[in-house]
Regions:
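N-proximal low-complexity "stem/linker" segments adjacent to membrane-targeting elements
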Residues: 1-24
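Short loop->beta transition adjacent to catalytic acidic/histidine clusters or analogous donor-positioning motifs
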Residues: 2, 23-37, 58-62
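Short, thiol/selenol-centered motifs that function as redox-active sites or metal-ligating centers
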Residues: 8-12, 35-40
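Short, well-ordered loop/turn elements at secondary-structure boundaries
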Residues: 9, 24-27, 101-103, 117
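Short alpha-helix within the catalytic core of nucleotide-sugar-dependent glycosyltransferases
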Residues: 16-19, 116-122
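Active-site-proximal specificity loops/subdomain of glycosyltransferases
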Residues: 36-108, 117
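Acidic metal-phosphate-binding loop of nucleotide-sugar-dependent transferases
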Residues: 112-114
Length: 122
């Protein structure tokens, strides 16, 4: 199995490009979306609100919604932004099944860092 894992904000066109580019080499896409921006402001779930656009991939997308950020009273706003970003990225592991095997491939990258498909086929 090949798992392609990434955080998602609102880049719908880029998501479409990534899914189509990696369609033939990825078994499961793990898309992690937060209900907050890294600055802590509420945001809509753009993937959830546009799921029909990606219906071709619906059986292969594991959509993780992050809404359980830790709160710290004495942390600066800037540091909380980094904490939220890291928390969201670490939530990728919630989508990797416990049945994953040692021989499985897990790709973790930013949405715009699309692996070269030919390399995945090798």
């Amino acid at each position: 199995m090949v798992y392609d894992c990434f955080c998602f904000f609102n880049e719908l066109d880029l998501l479409e490009i990534r899914l189509n580019t990696l369609d033939k080499v990825v078994d499961k896409f793990i898309l992690v979306e937060s209900q907050l921006t890294h600055s802590g402001h509420p945001k809509p779930l753009h993937y959830a609100n546009n799921k029909e656009r990606f219906s071709k991939f619906s059986q292969r997308i594991i959509h993780i919604i992050v809404n359980d950020f830790p709160e710290f009273k004495n942390i600066t706003h800037n540091k909380m932004s980094w904490i939220r970003e890291n928390w969201q990225r670490n939530a990728i592991f919630r989508g990797i099944p416990k049945t994953a095997k040692d021989e499985d491939y897990i790709i973790i990258s930013d949405l715009d860092e699309i692996p070269f498909r030919q390399k995945q086929l090798e």
